[in-house]
Every structure is written in C-alpha cells, then in structure tokens.
C-alpha cells in the first residue's frame, strides 16, 4: 500500500479505506504465513515479500509493471511467470473474449462512460491490451 501513498499520492485515510474494501470484497486473496519465506527469495530485496506470497499461495504468475525486480532466475524455480498487465489481460481475453468485453462494458456503465471512453482511460495503463482489443472489436 506504500505505493498508493508515495506514487499515486493517496492519503493514509484513502489508503486505509481501499485496504478495508479489498479485504471485505476479496477476503480469499490475502496471503498469510509467507513471512518465513521472504529471506529465501532471490529477487530484489524490496519485492521479496511479493514473491514469497506468490510461492506460499501457489500462484502461477505475478502481474506487475516492475518486471526488473522479478528476474527469471528468481521466479522460474518456483514455476512462477512474471507478466505485465497488458499481457495478463490479453491472456484473460483470449480465454473468454465475451466475458472480458462484458466486464469492461459493465465497468464503463458503472462509471457513467461509454465503452470507447472507458477504453481511452484504460489505454493509459494498459495500451497494448486496449489497442489489441480495439482492433478485435473494430472500434
């Protein structure tokens, strides 16, 4: 959550609210008991807790913009692939295009936007995914 405060500039109050919402709506996603694994991780020291949590829960991948701190030599022994967000979203889209488009339309509607407007916003964070999606949808 430190990244939300330092990089995005969220206040402690907003960060605490977000964490509370994440815990309430994604209770099964919290990893516990990974702390003892941190010291044995070989990736960048400031991100060892992330790899330790992925190992503990049996994750197949870590999705991050920060691939440089998760070298293949550190993740491959654990069978963990490191992907950027655009790659991960494209993988989900390839698995079930209709569901991904449905969820994007739902997200846009919830935010009072059209799908093209929402995709324009998402393009800032995941340009390769949005470009590919727009090409597929011909929009």
Segment roles from a protein language model:
Residues 1-34, 107-125:
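PIN-domain endoribonuclease scaffold, especially VapC-family toxins
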Residues 6, 37-41, 69:
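Short histidine/acidic/glycine/proline-rich micro-motifs that form metal-
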Residues 10-17, 49, 83, 99:
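Generic recognition of short, well-ordered alpha-helical interface segments
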Residues 13-14, 46, 56, 67, ...:
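Context-gated lysine
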Residues 17, 25, 65, 91-93:
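Sequence-level detector for tyrosine residue identity
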Residues 68-139:
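Acidic, PIN/NYN-like endoribonuclease modules and their adjacent C-terminal/linker elements
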